[in-house]
């Protein structure tokens, strides 16, 4: 699973996930990309599940880039514990996603295969996504 090696603080406030993605919104490494259309949170498990779906479909061909990293801790109190007594323990890590954020990139495969692979990966994610190609200026 993806998670930071070390952080300055163990726990973070919930915060807001507003606005559009300006950074990480262009296809930078590969030819084709899976881009978010809606906002939400991706857990480390969801990112890994989609990555596995991608790599299994493209088999030996192509190179894949993961453009998101879960760097925000989400806490949860144990079951059947009364409210109060401080914030719960870190349960899992999430990446906050805004519309326009590139999630995965791929190169070295045909467009048809890339579309199929991204469709399988998108089924594992709780966000609406779209397929984009690299634009050469």
Curated annotation (Swiss-Prot):
One of its GO terms (cellular component) is cytosolic large ribosomal subunit. This is Large ribosomal subunit protein uL16. Part of the 50S ribosomal subunit. The keyword Ribosomal protein applies. InterPro entries: Ribosomal_uL16 (IPR047873), Ribosomal_uL16_bact-type (IPR000114), Ribosomal_uL16_CS (IPR020798), Ribosomal_uL16_dom (IPR016180), Ribosomal_uL16_sf (IPR036920). Binds 23S rRNA and is also seen to make contacts with the A and possibly P site tRNAs. Belongs to the universal ribosomal protein uL16 family. PANTHER family: 50S/60S RIBOSOMAL PROTEIN L16 (PTHR12220), LARGE RIBOSOMAL SUBUNIT PROTEIN UL16M (PTHR12220:SF13). Disulfide bonds: none annotated. The keyword tRNA-binding applies. It holds the Pfam family Ribosomal_L16. One of its GO terms (molecular function) is structural constituent of ribosome. One of its GO terms (biological process) is translation. Keywords: Ribonucleoprotein, Ribosomal protein, RNA-binding, rRNA-binding, tRNA-binding. The gene is rplP. HAMAP family: Ribosomal_uL16. It comes from Azotobacter vinelandii (strain DJ / ATCC BAA-1303).
């Amino acid at each position: 699973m993806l998670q930071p090696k070390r952080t300055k603080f163990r726990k973070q406030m919930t915060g807001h996930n507003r606005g559009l993605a300006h950074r990480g919104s262009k296809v930078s490494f590969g030819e084709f990309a899976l881009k978010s259309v809606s906002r939400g949170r991706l857990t480390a498990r969801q990112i890994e599940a989609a990555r596995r779906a991608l790599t299994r479909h493209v088999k030996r061909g192509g190179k894949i880039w993961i453009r998101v990293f879960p760097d925000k801790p989400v806490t949860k109190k144990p079951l059947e514990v009364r409210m109060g007594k401080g914030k719960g323990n870190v349960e899992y890590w999430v990446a906050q996603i805004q519309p326009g954020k590139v999630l995965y990139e791929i190169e070295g495969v045909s467009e048809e295969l890339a579309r199929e692979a991204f469709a399988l990966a998108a089924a594992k994610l709780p966000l609406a996504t779209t397929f984009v190609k690299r634009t050469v200026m």
